[in-house]
Curated annotation (Swiss-Prot):
GO terms for cellular component: cytosol. Keywords: Nucleotide-binding. Pfam families: DUF520. Nucleotide-binding protein. This is Nucleotide-binding protein AFE_0977. InterPro entries: DUF520, UPF0234-like_C, UPF0234_N, YajQ-like_sf. Belongs to the YajQ family. The keyword Nucleotide-binding applies. GO terms for molecular function: nucleotide binding. The keyword Oxidoreductase does not apply.
Length: 161
């Protein structure tokens, strides 16, 4: 029985590369001259620190442009609220969404059932396995899942016949 896996992954190396080029650009930009703005990644979070919200917004714009250039989907980025940090600075945390949550997997299974596809979905940890009777049915399911917005980037792996 043919099957494939639906996953949501982010290439952390590309995120690091985008982060480093953004930091390099911030150090050379005129509007950040003399600023103590900083940006760092800790596991699945990117922490931005700057003097005011305007600079935080500029940093997010620069980072998102670099991420898009590197092929990282911006749906994987969840922007947190601005909070006060030490020394009169502002802090903002960007979370990277990695893996399918159970709720999103259930929505995908419901989407496949409502679409009358001859494919069944089963949740396996942070991924979804979809199996069906024919390859054509699975390819139609992939096309439908790609066309629908679930709020996070989805990739299709492990296609088996």
């Amino acid at each position: 029985m043919p099957s494939f896996d639906v996953v949501s992954e982010v290439d952390m190396q590309e995120v690091d590369n985008a982060l480093h080029t953004t930091v390099k650009e911030i150090t050379t930009r005129y509007d950040f001259k003399g600023s103590k703005a900083s940006m760092e990644r800790k596991e699945k979070e990117i922490i931005l620190v700057a003097e005011d919200e305007y600079k935080l917004g500029q940093m997010i714009d620069l980072l998102s442009a670099r991420l898009v250039k590197r092929g990282v989907d911006l749906k994987a980025l969840e922007v947190g609220k601005v909070a006060a940090a030490a020394g009169g600075m502002e802090r903002q945390v960007l979370s990277l969404k990695v893996g399918l949550e159970t709720e999103v997997s259930k929505r995908m299974i419901k989407f496949l059932k409502d679409g009358k596809f001859k494919a069944q979905g089963s949740i396996q940890g942070d991924q979804l396995r979809v199996s069906g009777k024919s390859r054509d049915e699975l390819q139609a399911a992939i096309a439908a899942l790609r066309g629908h917005d679930f709020g996070l980037p989805v990739q299709f792996t492990n296609f088996r016949d």
